[in-house]
Amino acid sequence: MVSFGIDLVEVSRIRRLLERRGERALVRLFSPSEIEYALRARPPLSYQRLAARFAAKEAFIKALGRPVPFREMEVVSKGKQPYLRWRGNDCPLSLSHTGDFAIALVMIPEELIPPRTGP
């Protein structure tokens, strides 16, 4: 069985985080290529791109059902299609952003879902 995760992020939340913590927050949450891609655009698009990637990582954690350090995940593109890469595996991903919201939906294939333990 596959697992799906979805997350919605306010772009202003990411903007405020970066205004307060700057580069420290960027390198803690995003890979160098994610940062480079986002910062190729000027605000507000750069904030929207980062918010979408943040939402993708949150959606992945929800779908997986356990915490994962943000730096272990990376949003990558194959052509125009984004994927969330984790441990060398690419999970299908859909991203969208507009105004003050970014949303992500990720699908984790069955073989990547850890077995449940306990009752």
Language-model features, listed with the residues they occupy:
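Core catalytic alpha/beta fold that binds nucleotide/phospho-ligands
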Residues: 1-119
